[in-house]
């Protein structure tokens, strides 16, 4: 494989495409690259390491063939909180249902507390996005501007305009989670 010039300028804006079963061939990756894709995303929640490794090899082959670099983004399986809806309802939490509606909030400078979770839903609520509001509203009253968006991948981001102490923030979440009797593993991402 040819080596790329390390000093060559790369585009800062990336067009990311998730590679999955429908794009599982070198030809498909090449077609995506020709139509403007700059980065392939590999979701390690689905597929084994050998399958994902083959996709990386294909991307490198296409990259060498065309003569331009293709970035590879690995979306590894992160920590998950498994919410048992029945258990939450027994705790008398207010759960609000909304059909295909979510709040999106993206200021230029903010801190994100980012975590993944899986909702175990009954057939009735499978089509709806759930918002668990009651316990999280306590954070709003503590001078945080809180916005909550649910995405297709069930990834939640909490965005804070102010710059609170991260440890204070995590301890607030720890209290909430302790009241739910659920263990939370989280990571803090700082957006610059």
UniProtKB/Swiss-Prot annotation:
Known pathway: Carbohydrate degradation; glycolysis; pyruvate from D-glyceraldehyde 3-phosphate: step 5/5
Record's keyword annotation contains Aminoacyl-tRNA synthetase: no
EC primary class: transferase
Pfam family, one: PK
UniProt keyword annotations, A-Z: ATP-binding, Glycolysis, Kinase, Magnesium, Metal-binding, Nucleotide-binding, Potassium, Pyruvate, Transferase
Record-linked SUPFAM superfamilies: Phosphoenolpyruvate/pyruvate domain
Obligatory cofactor(s): Mg(2+); K(+)
Database matches in InterPro entries: Pyr_Knase, Pyrv/PenolPyrv_kinase-like_dom, Pyrv_kinase-like_dom_sf, Pyrv_Knase_brl
Gene3D superfamilies according to UniProt: Phosphoenolpyruvate-binding domains (3.20.20.60)
Source organism superkingdom: Bacteria
GO molecular function per UniProt: ATP binding; kinase activity; magnesium ion binding; potassium ion binding; pyruvate kinase activity
UniProt binding sites for ATP: 43-46
Protein EC: 2.7.1.40
Chain sites annotated for binding substrate: 41
Catalytic function, reaction form: pyruvate + ATP = phosphoenolpyruvate + ADP + H(+)
UniProt binding sites for K(+): 43, 45, 75-76
Family named by the database record: Belongs to the pyruvate kinase family.
The protein's name: Pyruvate kinase
Organism this protein belongs to: Spiroplasma citri
Source species taxonomy: Bacteria, Bacillati, Mycoplasmatota, Mollicutes, Entomoplasmatales
């Amino acid at each position: 494989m040819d080596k790329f010039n390390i000093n060559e300028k790369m585009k800062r804006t990336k067009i990311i495409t998730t590679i999955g079963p429908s794009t599982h061939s070198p030809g498909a990756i090449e077609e995506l690259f020709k139509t403007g894709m700059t980065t392939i995303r590999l979701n390690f929640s689905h597929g084994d390491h050998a399958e994902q490794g083959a996709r990386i090899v294909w991307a490198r082959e296409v990259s060498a063939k065309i003569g331009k670099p293709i970035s590879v983004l690995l979306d590894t399986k992160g920590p998950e909180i498994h919410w048992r809806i029945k258990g939450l309802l027994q705790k008398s939490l207010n759960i609000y249902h909304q059909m295909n509606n979510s709040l999106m909030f993206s200021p230029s400078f903010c801190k994100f507390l980012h975590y993944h979770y899986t909702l175990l839903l009954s057939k009735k609520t499978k089509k709806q996005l759930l918002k668990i509001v009651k316990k999280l509203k306590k954070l709003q009253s503590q001078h945080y501007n809180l916005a909550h968006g649910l995405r297709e991948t069930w990834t939640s981001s909490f965005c804070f305009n102010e710059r609170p102490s991260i440890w204070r923030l995590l301890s607030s979440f720890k209290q909430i989670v302790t009241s739910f009797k659920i263990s939370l593993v989280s990571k803090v991402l700082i957006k610059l």
